[in-house]
Amino acid sequence: MRIAFFLLVLAVIIGFAYGYSCPKPCYGNMCCSTSPNNQYYLTDFCGSTSACGPVPSCSGALYFTADSQRFGCGKYLNLCRSGKCVKAQIYDAGPAMWVEQDAGMMIIDASPTICHVLTGGSSCGWSDHFLITATVTSLTDSRPLGPFNVTESEMAQLFIDHEIAMAQCEAEKTCNGFDLE
């Protein structure tokens, strides 16, 4: 009986430690899948190369993210946490799949400015477990890049807009690693 209990506890611990597995690996070391509930951990980055063209400067108030393999280069995301949101543009790919596996969840890599706006902190690592919601913006969204607040009904509309935008990019094969097929 003790052995069975020990094995059960061990299985639960291993399940938590290795609970995340990317449903759609791509580019050798990244995940092309999107979160079914739009929930991600927030991390920050400032790179010297970009998968989508020019490298944004890491100084100043800039609103950019990675995750082009999921959503497409140049697309816009609304990143939200506790009613506060930031509209950002996708400039790069990433993060590496091993980072998400270590975190146990999908990640949105964003500029240090976004990290500060949404958390009040100076850095965001996967072990901080800053949970955010990420949605692709509507094609008709004219909101400028940067922070904004949302009500519950506005947040619900962001989810609707996200579903429409994702259906379009999947039809056009410009997201979720469709260019690999």
From Swiss-Prot:
Cellular component terms (Gene Ontology): cytoplasmic vesicle; cytoplasmic vesicle lumen; vesicle lumen
Signal peptide: 1-19
Keywords tagged on the record: Antibiotic, Antimicrobial, Bacteriolytic enzyme, Cytoplasmic vesicle, Disulfide bond, Glycosidase, Hydrolase, Signal
Reported consequences of knocking out the gene: Mutants have only 40% of the wild-type lysozyme activity and initially form plaques on bacterial lawns that are only half the size of wild type plaques. Despite the lysozyme activity remaining constantly at 40% of wild-type, the efficiency of plaque formation gradually increases over several weeks repeated plating until the size of mutant plaques finally exceeds that of wild-type cells by almost 2-fold.
GO biological process: defense response to Gram-positive bacterium; killing of cells of another organism; peptidoglycan catabolic process; phagocytosis; response to cadmium ion
Compartments, record wording: Cytoplasmic vesicle lumen
Catalytic activity: Hydrolysis of 1,4-beta-linkages between N-acetylmuramic acid and N-acetyl-D-glucosamine residues in a peptidoglycan
Keyword rRNA-binding listed: no
Temperature-related behavior of activity: Stable when incubated at 50 degrees Celsius for 10 minutes at pH 5.5. Activity decreases by 50% when incubated at 60 degrees Celsius for 10 minutes at pH 5.5.
PTM annotation, UniProt: Contains six disulfide bonds.
Entry EC number(s): 3.2.1.n3
Known role: Has antibacterial activity against the Gram-positive bacteria B.subtilis, B.megaterium and M.luteus. No antibacterial activity detected against the Gram-positive bacterium S.aureus or against the Gram-negative bacterium E.coli. Lacks chitinase activity.
Record-given protein name: Lysozyme A
Species: Dictyostelium discoideum (Social amoeba)
Lineage of the organism: Eukaryota, Amoebozoa, Evosea, Eumycetozoa, Dictyostelia
